[in-house]
């Protein structure tokens, strides 16, 4: 699901604020094959087409990304223009599905800006911090302990955890060096 914003003139934009690393850094015009520059040499677009899992007459909007014009497009997710209500979200609560990627991994992303332009991003997936600038990704740091990761959240993302928040990961699947022993991302 994404938010679809309709302007007074009828123009629609898809706004996805939660996808993560290869997500769009700005609203995308809801127009098939409209290419938007994202970060560095990375392009993103939406296409309105069928997917192999559906019948041929059912079209979905697909979010695609490529890291440079000469590379192929990668499809990441798809969505419809179906409207969802509060009651729909209640039954789709994360508490009903505790095994999805976002509840079993520690994730953070920060877009790097100079004035108004996004030129890169820094990402944390479990115990690994990666930096992506100019379409190239490199590992910045690998954490061995939960204490190191907590310090890294502050250093790389400006996130300071309270003592209660630090205690909250103990014994969980994503805990580093503990019972949960998270897996590298």
Where are these regions (language model features)?
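His-Asp-centered catalytic microenvironments across diverse enzyme cores
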Residues: 1-141
């Amino acid at each position: 699901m994404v938010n679809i914003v309709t302007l007074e003139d009828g123009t629609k934009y898809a706004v996805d604020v939660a996808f993560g690393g290869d997500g769009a850094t700005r609203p995308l015009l809801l127009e098939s094959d409209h290419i938007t520059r994202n970060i560095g040499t990375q392009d993103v677009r939406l296409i309105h087409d069928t997917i192999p899992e559906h019948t041929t007459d059912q079209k979905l909007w697909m979010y695609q990304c490529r890291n440079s014009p000469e590379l192929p497009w990668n499809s990441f997710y798809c969505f419809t223009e179906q409207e969802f209500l509060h009651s729909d979200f209640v039954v789709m609560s994360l508490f009903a599905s505790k095994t999805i990627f976002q509840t079993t991994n520690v994730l953070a992303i920060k877009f790097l800006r100079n004035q108004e332009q996004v030129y890169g991003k820094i990402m944390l997936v479990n115990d690994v911090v990666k930096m992506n600038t100019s379409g190239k990704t490199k590992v910045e740091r690998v954490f061995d302990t939960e204490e190191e990761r907590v310090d890294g959240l502050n250093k790389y993302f400006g996130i300071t955890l309270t003592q209660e928040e630090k205690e909250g990961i103990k014994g969980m699947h994503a805990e580093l060096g503990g019972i949960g022993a998270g897996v590298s991302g």
